[in-house]
Amino acid sequence: MKPDRDTLDEYFEYDAEEFLVSLALLITEGRTPECSVKGRTESFHCPPAQSCYPVTTKHECSDKLAQCRQARRTRSEVTLLWKNNLPIMVEMMLLPDCCYSDDGPTTEGIDLNDPAIKQDALLLERWILEPVPRQNGDRFIEEKTLLLAVRSFVFFSQLSAWLSVSHGAIPRNILYRISAADVDLQWNFSQTPIEHVFPVPNVSHNVALKVSVQSLPRQSNYPVLTCSIHTNIGLYEKRIQQHKLKTHQHHNPNEAEQCGTNSSQRLCSKQTWTMAPESVLHAKSGPSPEYTAAVKNIKLYPGTGSKSDHGTSQANILGFSGIGDIKSQETSVRTLKSFSMVDSSISNRQSFWQSAGETNPLIGSLIQERQEIIARIAQHLIHCDPSTSHVSGRPFNTQESSSLHSKLFRVSQENENVGKGKEAFSMTFGSPEFSSPEDTNEGKIRLKPETPRSETCISNDFYSHMPVGETNPLIGSLLQERQDVIARIAQHLEHIDPTASHIPRQSFNMHDSSSVASKVFRSSYEDKNLLKKNKDESSVSISHTKCSLLGDISDGKNLVPNKCFTSFKNNSKEKCSLKHQTRNQCQNNPSEIIQSTYQETQNKSSSLSTSSILSQHKENNLDLTSRFKEQEMSNGIDKQYSNCTTIDKQICTNKYKEKIINENYNPKFFGNLQSDDSKKNDSKIKVTVLEMSEYLNKYESMSSNKDSKRPKTCEQNTQLNSIENYLNKDNEGFKCKKSDQLKNEQDKQEDPTNEKSQNYSQRRSIKDCLSTCEQPKNTEVLRTTLKHSNVWRKHNFHSLDGTSTRAFHPQTGLPLLSSPVPQRKTQSGCFDLDSSLLHLKSFSSRSPRPCLNIEDDPDIHEKPFLSSSAPPITSLSLLGNFEESVLNYRFDPLGIVDGFTAEVGASGAFCPTHLTLPVEVSFYSVSDDNAPSPYMGVITLESLGKRGYRVPPSGTIQVTLFNPNKTVVKMFVVIYDLRDMPANHQTFLRQRTFSVPVKQEVKRSVNKENIRHTEERLLRYLIHLRFQSSKSGKIYLHRDVRLLFSRKSMEVDSGAAYELKSYTESPTNPQFSPRC
């Protein structure tokens, strides 16, 4: 026979050994880094926060997962120490990122006895779990309480704060060490630690567990972690600076005198590569496993040079592939090699944050000192990089943007601000795009600065004039795999780099460049933010136009997402070859040109520049241009257009065909287009846009007749030779065939004034245009307005019990007024109550009231129909009123809503475990006017056992009610004192919450019955608690907890002069009754 639990002093929810393992796993895996807003998570091995929650999917450990292997190792170590009655010590520390892996809290592959690790590691926490003799006394805590306290400490720890502010980016190398709590085995803190001792629970009948933790004081900045291997990099940096100065003086001593001798004193934001903070990058897109593993495991390989996998071309874009000896600097050319850390100058770092508005200074402060080491390594890597670049005549000054991520060395932008009022755009290159020889051999670019040497001497510290040297192929194969890893990381970072540079670029000329793959021109935030600052157009002449670059002559407000930007000068020679070029374009890639008719319809001020530039492209650049334009749209227009049918493409193409046939040889039109493009005058642009819109309106009728014929393709028609010249980004006049046919005849007869007004009305979003394009012909677009919930009241809804109601939803039967039941938005735009949550039961076939057809009686609509639903006044005896009838199930519910839950807890002499239990919520139809009643909820406690939920003899009971959306509906707090309750007795408490006028004072008399005589107060919430005492005098909540709650929240009522007041009542004569 099972002994009565009351005969025992206490019971234990956990086995002592299992509880200890749960604590250790919570400490070691309770803040596992992850790429999210929270930055960390609890692993599957941690004990659940709420033991009452059902375990949906139980985790099964696998030997293939490193975390599972580590958890198994932790379990075995803790168990072994506990069986030997030894105190357990868990130390948490950080390791430098340069020479240690970041696979998480694991010790695999790491020798913890290595003195180098002990020297490099930063100890953050030291936990001691020590068994002590059993604690005796009235005041004790349960194991669950200690588990909650440890979880709270872990949640608010310093490590959790770092992970949270960096969204899981830093720190990455977290190491946990489990050992016996011996003084000789303890590692030392860098500062005096802060100690915290937790309450001591009994884990068995003989043993209690004492848990204490020592932690490092809170740090304002992320600590500097330097490993013993790389502490001598500062020597390299000094030698590099001396060598740079020597080389620079050898080539141009005059410039060296002007620029000074100390490179550290010439940190200029326009001539540095600023390191983007890791956490800023990962805040938007977390690091992939490939990224983190690759970046963190970059080692320093010795060597004297390398043959880059970029190929043997001398005009490669610089990509950092490895580190070499200092001697290799004598035999290699560095055209792009300026590098500086964000934190190398305080003012420089602040200006960087101001220019990159998306960065967070808090994150930068955390990793500021950490990146100092990375900067030195990167500085060394720059001078040891084997890549070469042929510079024609003069050094090319570079501007490196903040998109350079830590340990990823690539050139993102090449620029300099050199002119007096000159402003230029730049090209953006990433090293992974030139990872194949065929790409780089075709993409050789010779750069010729337009500025004299005297203007570029300001940044002579950041480049060197070294002759073109021979690269050493001996370590090329060694660095090949490393370069591939960096290329993949760079490609990943191209899409998630949030930082930007606002510095204008230097103008340069392009020579001998053939068709470069379109992947070179990748989108970057640096150039977009650059355009916001540029108010003028820079002039860059491109010889032979080998590389097709799109221009933007806007005022900086209308942006085109850019792969690379420049603007072009118009010349007569290019005008002459306009027809031939556009004809070739149409013959080669008609489908891409057709797509561009939609892709180029967003930006008005950029449209004329784009059309004139595209007309100057040569035949060998068409493929690049088309690909680039397809990537250009920033608002998903290209994606939307892909949903259009082939017929729609042909329709749009035919409209342009008709326009081009009549306008292709119109020199006046070309003159207007070229004039507006070159002058950059807003008024001229508007005139040209209007003129093009008039042409569209003029020939839409002609195109509509041929659209009905639906020709198969337009690829073979040479009449499309000038499509690119008529792209108008303000057009919406490229409207789809459906809209064109509806307005065809009116467009013919409209005068210019009407055309202008129509042109203005057509300036809607391109998304509307595309959605209209997808509609069938001769189909009207139906607009459905958002319906208010009162619309449902107009339906004559008959409930299942025979009553007609206008107060409940016609489909779900739920109350129409604001309800705790979650809403969902239907396809029609109306908000319905979720019918999936509704289950109807216990319907009465008889109706106590006649059927009211309110809509048929017009007099009722003119008079306010006052609700007579209970409780109007709770002034009579309890028997027979609404409150007692509902609480005692005298009403049949109209329906039951699933999904409500409640958290039940208590506090007093001890704190029992909080429970989360389901709540059965029902509603009724009780009034003559069918007004909805309050909801009733029942929390069943029978699942906890025959006795129920044990609570202290006196204290507070808290019941928090959640709706199916897990939103708090009401929190009930009931203060009670049952210390006088005899054994084997029972009683109840009932707390009512009323809404009463704010200015009216309720006068309390000796007789509590008078409280209920205020006519203006309304019952909003009620909770009914049942208590019973065991034979030993312990108090339990038993059977169930019953709730009444309002249809809508009254705490934040709209301007009502009411307040909520609660009153708790209990039986008085007798106060306690014997148990049955």
UniProtKB/Swiss-Prot annotation:
Region annotation (Transactivation domain 1 (TAD1)) ranges: 24-32
Region (Transactivation domain 2 (TAD2)): 962-970
Pfam families: Chromosome_seg (PF13889), DUF4210 (PF13915)
Keywords: Nucleus
Residue numbers spanned by region Required for macropage invasion: 878-935
Subcellular location: Nucleus
Highest taxon, organism lineage: Eukaryota
Regions of compositional bias (Basic and acidic residues) in chain numbering: 739-754
Region of interest called Disordered, as start-end residue ranges on this chain: 700-721, 739-765
Matching InterPro entries: Atos-like_C, Atos-like_cons_dom, ATOS_Transcription_Regulators
Family classification: Belongs to the ATOS family.
Function summary: Transcription regulator that syncronizes transcriptional and translational programs to promote macrophage invasion of tissues.
Protein name: Atos homolog protein A
Lineage: Eukaryota, Metazoa, Chordata, Craniata, Vertebrata
